[in-house]
UniProtKB/Swiss-Prot annotation:
ATP binds at residues 436, 582, 585. Residues 60-374 are annotated as: OAS domain 1. It is found in: Cytoplasm; Cytoplasm, Perinuclear region. The gene is Oas2. PROSITE patterns: 25A_SYNTH_1, 25A_SYNTH_2, 25A_SYNTH_3. Produced as a latent enzyme which is activated by double stranded RNA (dsRNA) generated during the course of viral infection. The dsRNA activator must be at least 15 nucleotides long, and no modification of the 2'-hydroxyl group is tolerated. ssRNA or dsDNA do not act as activators. Strongly inhibited by copper, iron and zinc ions. Partially inhibited by cobalt and nickel ions. GO terms for cellular component: perinuclear region of cytoplasm. This is 2'-5'-oligoadenylate synthase 2. It catalyses: 3 ATP = 5'-triphosphoadenylyl-(2'->5')-adenylyl-(2'->5')-adenosine + 2 diphosphate. Changing residue 405 to N: Mice display postpartum failure of lactation and strongly reduced milk protein synthesis. Otherwise, mice develop normally and mammary glands are normal. It comes from Mus musculus. Keywords: Acetylation, Antiviral defense, ATP-binding, Cytoplasm, Glycoprotein, Immunity, Innate immunity, Lipoprotein, Magnesium, Metal-binding, Myristate, Nucleotide-binding, Nucleotidyltransferase, Repeat, RNA-binding, Transferase. Its cofactor is Mg(2+).
Length: 742
């Protein structure tokens, strides 16, 4: 068992750990947070610990960070076990004397983010006699006096600090400054709290005029649960960030507020959730991401909806008030009234220190130095009048990025045309740049470069289906041999398919500041050379439709053959519509990332087409209100069960074979969204994908500040029909759809 030493920062003794806590140590724990005790601790550190204090973590090479954490920052497991036993002994003593129903462990100790050496912790005592938040205000001090008295009777020393008693739990190699906090327990079960808990919290705070976050300790159980679900490696990253923060404090004359430490822990969790979510990640990459976020305090707005959300009006108003307040905002995920990131004048100092480490040689041992793509604030809290700025600042790639992408694409296209099939009978007919980069809708750091390579040996849809996997393998083989003679680094993604349709890889080069992800797809040249005044060969579609009728072909299986048409359909659109497309894609990606468990969502291309349709039908102008466009697309997603959308720009109802096929397509189960380049491609898919999940997310977003305009109320969607018919597209055909003649 460990020593329970109060107010005494003497070195550990070799005896007295067998049972309970040894009395001893001078009275009077220093009243400030842990960082105020650093000088006292320093004098009693072992030589190795003293050495650690002198080594700036910012000087540790990136490849050695993991070893640094394991060797210097992580507490010893046996020490933590002894700490647990000592804390449990405190709990056993107190519950035998006072009406404590249960306890929760908080602070760094409870969150399992305690640093080796000295750290903070709390033992929250849920008092059986506290029936409401107000009781905590009325009776907390009285119970602290009772607890202090019982501790003295048992020769256990403590110091009263604000609304807590502070004791030191000490074992060899580890000390915890433990606050004892008698509080009200608003959670009557182990389940997630209902909105009533937070409505009651707001009501009680108003009655007693409590400060924001004053009752946050009541939610320690939730805080413990919140951190428990995260992988150990993320907690190791938190230790690294906290250790850096402690070293920063030593340079500052005035100690920062204790909540800032918790804010950095939450910011680290946010960075990992938004940018990684993998249990095995590069530690330096995580550090760079956190430091980049710290550099942007005036934009930081971080929150979670795991314990509270926007459904209840009272809770929604609390949240919106917080999210509209001055940045930085980092909300406690267990208490919406508690902004632990509030700026008390220290963020500027922290920003300077973050910049110094971020651009230090030790953290830039490779070029480019990778980091996760994480925004400092979510789209949800962006006011409607700032959406254009959000797109420009966070989503739209700069000219340098686009130049880098172009250079990378040119490198691969040159390889495909001039090297890959040099000694083969197969010839490259053409390479076509596809995907968001070619369409002009690429996201900053979040878009792939697609290259479709049309090969002479692929002479039909059938030959493409049969032979494309061998061409994928051949391209990979040739590329692997070629890069050995170049200053490139290529990492191939292992396909989950036995017969892969695409070669996916990441390209790094000394000439590129960013690594670029590629998808290379072999294709059959069904269209030949396109010209703007050229009417498409009807054979291309006729052959495709006949093949689909005779064989079990998945819808859109050969859409890759029509990449040029897909690209041109978007590429020619106004710049502002492309901005709206970026916004919708970002919204989609954010939901895709947070969705648990994972499900099969509709393809992003479906959302792109839905966005174009909304603009065509609702605006059609080069200059429109982004918030209205965004709101309209979400409205269409919510109405997915009614959607029937198609275009007649590349095919129409004139030819008999096409007319019959299209009439069959548009009478399928909703939603129906036909690819304007490929009539066999229904990216709406009926019930093939989980549209209902996307619709639920869209409904939640209707309460977002994105759609609130002061004085004018809510942003209204454009008036857009959810269903098209051949007649509405000028086809002079009025079929029966859903039992109604259109």
């Amino acid at each position: 068992m460990g020593n329970w030493l109060t107010g005494n920062w003497s070195s550990d003794r070799s005896s007295g750990y067998s049972s309970g806590w040894s009395p001893g140590g001078s009275s009077g724990v220093p009243s400030g947070p842990v960082h105020k005790l650093e000088k006292s601790i320093q004098a009693n550190l072992t030589p190795n610990e003293n050495c650690l204090k002198q080594i700036a973590v910012s000087s540790v090479p990136s490849q050695k960070l993991e070893g640094y954490i394991q060797e210097n920052l992580k507490p010893n497991r046996e020490s933590l076990k002894q700490i647990d036993q000592a804390v449990d002994a405190i709990w056993d003593l107190l519950r035998s004397q006072i009406p404590v129903k249960e306890v929760a462990k908080g602070g760094s100790y409870g969150r399992e983010t305690a640093l080796r050496g000295c750290s903070d912790g709390t033992l929250v005592l849920f008092m059986d006699c506290f029936q409401q938040f107000q009781d905590q205000i009325k009776y907390q001090d009285a119970y602290l006096d009772v607890i202090e008295l019982w501790l003295k009777i048992h020769e256990k020393k403590s110091v009263k600090h604000e609304h807590a008693l502070v004791v030191q739990v000490s074992v060899p190699g580890q000390r915890i400054l433990l606050q004892l906090l008698p509080v009200f327990n608003p959670l009557r079960s182990n389940e997630n709290p209902s909105s009533c808990v937070y409505v009651d919290l707001k009501k009680s705070m108003d009655q007693v005029r409590a400060s924001p976050g004053e009752f946050s300790d009541c939610f320690t159980t939730l805080q413990q649960r919140f951190f428990k679900k995260y992988p150990q490696r993320l907690k190791d990253l938190i230790l690294l960030v906290k250790h850096w923060y402690e070293q920063c404090q030593e340079k500052w004359k005035t100690p920062p507020p204790q909540p800032l430490l918790y804010a950095l822990e939450l910011l680290t969790v946010y960075a990992w959730e938004q940018g990684c979510q993998a249990e095995d990640f590069d530690m330096a990459q995580g550090v760079r991401t956190v430091l980049r976020l710290i550099q942007r305090p005036t934009e930081l707005c971080v929150y979670w909806t795991v314990n509270y959300n926007f459904e209840d009006e009272t809770v929604r108003n609390i949240l919106l008030h917080q999210l509209r307040s001055q940045r930085p905002v980092i909300l406690d995920p267990t208490d919406p009234t508690n902004n632990v990131g509030k700026d008390d004048g220290f963020w500027e100092l922290l920003t300077e220190e973050a910049m110094a480490w971020l651009y230090s040689p030790s953290l830039n041992t490779e070029s480019p130095a990778p980091y996760w793509d994480v925004l400092p604030m979510p789209l949800f809290v962006t006011p409607s009048h700032l959406l254009n700025k959000f797109i420009k600042d966070f989503l739209q790639p700069n000219k340098l990025f686009l130049k880098q992408i172009k250079e990378a694409v040119d490198i691969i296209c040159s390889f495909l045309k001039n090297v890959c099939f040099l000694n083969s009978d197969t010839k490259v007919l053409k390479t076509v740049k596809g995907g968001s980069t070619a369409k002009g809708t690429a996201l900053k750091r979040g878009s792939d470069a697609d290259i479709v390579v049309f090969l002479s040996s692929l002479e039909s849809y059938d030959s493409l289906k049969t032979n494309r996997s061998q061409f994928v393998q051949e391209i990979q083989k040739q590329l692997e041999e070629f890069v050995q003679a170049q200053e490139w680094e290529v990492t191939f993604e292992i396909s989950k398919w036995k017969a892969p349709r695409v070669l996916s890889f990441t390209l790094k080069s000394k000439t590129l500041n960013e690594s670029v992800e590629f998808d290379v797809l072999p294709a059959y040249d069904a269209l030949g050379q396109l010209r703007s005044d050229f009417t498409l060969r009807p054979e291309a579609y006729k052959d495709l439709i006949e093949l689909c009728a005779s064989q079990d072909i998945k819808e859109g299986e050969f859409s890759i053959c029509f990449t040029e048409l897909q690209r041109n359909f978007i590429q020619t659109r106004p710049t502002k519509l492309k901005s709206l497309l970026r916004l919708i894609k970002h919204w989609y990606k954010q939901y895709e990332r947070k969705m648990k468990p994972k499900a099969s969502l509709p393809p992003k291309y479906a959302l792109e087409l839905l966005t174009v349709y909304a603009w065509e039908q609702g605006s059609g102008t080069d200059d429109f209100d982004i918030a209205e466009g965004f709101r309209t697309v979400l409205d269409l997603v919510i109405k997915y069960r009614q959607l029937c959308i198609f275009w007649t720009v590349n095919y129409n109802f004139e030819e008999e074979y096409m007319r019959k096929f299209l009439l069959t397509q548009i009478q399928k189960k909703r939603p129906v969204i036909l690819d304007p380049a490929d009539p066999t491609g229904d990216v709406g898919g009926g019930d093939r994908w989980c549209w209902h999940l996307l619709a639920e997310e869209a409904k939640e977003w209707l309460s977002s500040p994105c759609f609130q305009v002061e004085q004018k109320g809510l942003v209204q969607p454009w008036k857009v029909p959810v269903m098209q018919t051949p007649g509405s597209c000028g086809g002079q055909i009025y079929p029966t759809v859903g039992g109604v003649t259109k």
